[in-house]
Amino acid sequence: MAEVNIIYVTVFILKGITNRPELQAPCFGVFLVIYLVTVLGNLGLITLIKIDTRLHTPMYYFLSHLAFVDLCYSSAITPKMMVNFVVERNTIPFHACATQLGCFLTFMITECFLLASMAYDCYVAICSPLHYSTLMSRRVCIQLVAVPYIYSFLVALFHTVITFRLTYCGPNLINHFYCDDLPFLALSCSDTHMKEILIFAFAGFDMISSSSIVLTSYIFIIAAILRIRSTQGQHKAISTCGSHMVTVTIFYGTLIFMYLQPKSNHSLDTDKMASVFYTVVIPMLNPLIYSLRNKEVKDASKKALDKGCENLQILTFLKIRKLY
């Protein structure tokens, strides 16, 4: 019997967003600016919530974790994507690819359920304001944040281990700008049918369960707002959860576009464009949405800037006085 030599793949090549050389430099510049805004915006929001005691409430506790998750899953994707714009060969080692996939899945799933936790917080704030402090106690808030992190980590670990226990002995070109499950499975020389079923089963459960919590919460919220007689009261209720509504619409709208479009229109290139939006653009938009639409965040930002300017003036005065 003749021996068959099988060469196992240990390094993969990321196809990236574009292969056109004239677009590499402009794309690098655009994504560098977006990533810097993402880092500064989310770190700034986390710091602001930490230092301003007026923002030490359940809503901003969830928001600080949302900013952390946005920062993490953007950082899992964007830096490597930018490197690929300036190098000739966009390679990524086997274990680095596994790490990127695991981190991305962890933080993306966490975001889904954090948005659900925030929707529940809005529901309690508007529909049961008298019982808010009891229903949203510190212990409950910690649980509503800890459960998404733990569940997401376990699901991501499960998927990553199964994906990277498959055999890869053929082509090593991934038709994506990061290591995602479906484009990665296309390269495997093992039977991936069961793995594909698991992907859609878990993705379906995560999206349906988290979006159902969000949708149910907002049905009750809208019903409660419509029962408020004064226009001022309605505006106040809407402003409480307005930023969250915008964030939820953008995030779930993108995921629905990716997973619920007709199969005839579905392609990996379409997925790449949608992936750019929810891995790169949304993490940049979230802190801007909450900063521009939320009066308390704007007031806290103004207070922090005024204090910073005041400290700078005092420091400058002391330096000038020391010189003379």
UniProtKB/Swiss-Prot annotation:
- Reply yes or no: does the keyword Cell membrane apply: yes
| Location relative to the cell | Cell membrane
- Give the PROSITE patterns listed for this entry: G_PROTEIN_RECEP_F1_2
Q: Which residues form the signal peptide?
A: none
Which UniProt keywords are listed?
Answer: Cell membrane, Disulfide bond, G-protein coupled receptor, Glycoprotein, Membrane, Olfaction, Receptor, Sensory transduction, Transducer, Transmembrane, Transmembrane helix
Q: How does it sit in the membrane?
A: Multi-pass membrane protein
Q: Which GO terms describe its cellular component?
A: plasma membrane
Q: List the disulfide bonds.
A: 97-189
Q: Name one Pfam family in it.
A: 7tm_4
GO MF terms listed in the record are:
G protein-coupled receptor activity; olfactory receptor activity
All ranges on the Extracellular side of the membrane: 1-25, 76-99, 161-196, 259-271
Q: Which residues lie on this side of the membrane: Cytoplasmic?
A: 47-54, 121-139, 218-237, 293-324
Q: Which InterPro entries match?
A: GPCR_Rhodpsn, GPCR_Rhodpsn_7TM, Olfact_rcpt
Sugar-bearing residue positions: 265
The regions listed as transmembrane in this protein's record are 26-46, 55-75, 100-120, 140-160, 197-217, 238-258, 272-292
- Role noted for this protein: Odorant receptor.
Which family does the record claim for this protein?
Belongs to the G-protein coupled receptor 1 family.
Instruction: Please give the name of this protein.
Output: Olfactory receptor 8U3
- According to its UniProt entry, this protein's organism is Homo sapiens
Q: What is the lineage of its organism?
A: Eukaryota, Metazoa, Chordata, Craniata, Vertebrata
The UniProt gene name for this protein comes to OR8U3
